Amino acid sequence: MGNIRGTTRCPLTMSRRGWGRVLVCGRVAADEAGHDIVGAGECLAAPHVLRSMCHIRVREVLTSCVADHAVFLSVEGDAYVYGRNREGQCGVSGSGWLYHARCLDRERDFEPPLAADDVIATGATGATHTLLVTAQGAVYAAGSHEHGECGMHTRETPFKRVDMPFGVVHAACGRAWSLVVTREGHVYGMGSCESGVLGDGMYRHTGPSRLVYDCVWQPMRIAPLVNIARVSCGESHAAALDHEGYVEVWGTARLARLGGGTARGQGSPVRIPQFVRKQQRVRSVVCGRTSTWCVAQAHRLWAAGTWRAEGDGGPNQSVQIYRPLQELADYDVHCVAAGADTFQCLASSRVWSWGEAA
């Protein structure tokens, strides 16, 4: 279900009303088609209103560049799940794929049940797991826990509360790992440490040239990160934005996705020097599968890594350090979403899309 892969959190409201309808386009029913190329006749070539959500006022859509499922948050405080559910990542049982969005029950689908005065405020989706964050700072997780990505020792369905020392305000999920941001601006990670994505570089030598990465089964603080506002996860890298507009990145540097100008991966967070000057601080950062995107305070979109099949920004011409996207140089960019192969942004009151078959 490649069409829903993309982080769609935007600092702006979806409209002046503060809500909108869920639109979907591209390939659907990935459980049947797998990841094979499908014919154009099997894809939605234009945005369509998702029928099962047509009567719901939605304020936020949660998905990612590695997920084949999504969570829709309504203005009434309800959470709807949709898409692949083979590992229980939607928090409900009995179906490997949810063709119709399902509203999560506050008592049946959460353990312990959500408090009467609490609602789901935000969340994140990984490849086979989901995190939901409540307005009171609690974190609930569901799905696969093979590498510890849910912060517990068992696969969870329904959503089960994760033990956290502090209240959480933001979350992000990679393929087999998760990050959460607390009210104090600290970042905690859990899951697989492969490629240094948990910011501590933990690994074990099992031979002269073979490494085995450890797993973190409970939330562990990433000490170098302080005063953090938001985090974002790609396939095997991550980025953090602090309250002053500085950007920190870590993980694998393959295909230049970190934008640090080097092919060396980073096991601990490093600050991007291009955004140190006050005039070039960042307002939002989003990780794609093999790229990183930053919206500067001046509303310019900067990119690093690989996001095209060929040409500038392709595998043979990866962008080594962050640079403005020239196609949008004349527009004010407000937010950006990065999927597996496609990208969208809101610029000058228009939605722009690019990428594979965009």
Regions found by a protein language model. Name each.
Residues 1-358:
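Eukaryote-biased RCC1-like beta-propeller repeat architecture
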